[in-house]
Amino acid sequence: MCIRDRRIIRDTIAARAYDPLGYAAIPELTIDSAVIARSAQTDDVAIITIGRSCGEGADRLHATEYLLSDVEHRLIAQVSRAFHAARKRVIVVLNVSGVVEVASWRSLADAVVLSWLPGQEAGDAVCRVLTGKVCPSGRLTMTFPLRYEDCSTYDNFPYDYHGPKAIGNYPKIPRTPAIKNVHYVDYVEGMYVGYRYFDTFNRPVAYPFGFGLSYTTFAYSDAVCRAQADGNFALSVKVTNTGTCAGKEVVQVYAPVRSLRHQLVAFGKTRTLQPGESETLSLTITQRDLACFDEAQNAWVLDAGDYTLEIGANARDARLKAHIQVSAPLVVERVNGVLR
């Protein structure tokens, strides 16, 4: 937006009612369509920032935290229409504290940058990525679902319940039997949480676990896995920058565990590789990484069998495979059943 279209929002902030727990949101500013049209003619690119805060003592709400508001949807649509008509690009920066819905609007943007909450140097950090001074190499630590209803925890978590507010110490929360699982949650999903659920049951997602783009490309080769004397496994894989700019790559290794399709068992990042340059990463996969908790034994148990390792760029982008053989089941770690 050009200089003459800047607006002071101090009055909007001052008008917000006092809220000791910080749950109240600042009303979203609406931008006149004429301003957007004028900016599309004078500016090189549009950058839209979608913000979400975080806090303590309350869960993020589905309607106001996960979903974008009507004002945010209209802003993205109007800016996209105006700038694309002028053959210019639109970038959406997600300055958020958790997963937000992206499936309904991401096609309107040419790029989506997930900055999380980067603090006072956010502007400088994001600018360096957008201008190409830094080649992005971050990866998602969670799955972005198409809908919240697709999550395995959807049926068991009171996602739209907002407890009572109080100044000072938390009050005794009244019993609310009409709302499911407010006071007690039965985690019936068990191991099937996040990507372990989505990938095991082949559920479509917006962005898979471990996903992340780069300005360059990488090739994987020469994967070798060997058993070590201590019972762990040493994996090496060669990564080559096949693109046109320098960058780093995150290699991720997944293995099947019990009934799970796979779970992350190792990962590593290369140094900055110049175009055409290669590096061989050495990763260790421990017995504990491959083990699953057995309630009957109160222990982490490594099952016998053949394990196929998937080596790739994210949970749904396997580039290479390697194999591990475990000849007999092994109790890796015992724990005490103190909660029984």
Residue ranges, per PLM feature:
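Conserved small/polar residues in nucleotide/adenosyl-binding loops
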Residues: 1-6
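Acidic/histidine-rich helix-loop elements
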Residues: 9-33, 57-64
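An anion/phosphate-binding loop that grips the pyrophosphate of nucleotide cofactors and donors
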Residues: 43
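A short helix->loop->beta-strand "cap" motif at the edges of active sites that frequently abuts
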Residues: 82-90, 109
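Short, surface-exposed ligand- or partner-binding patches at beta-edge/loop junctions that are enriched
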Residues: 285-313
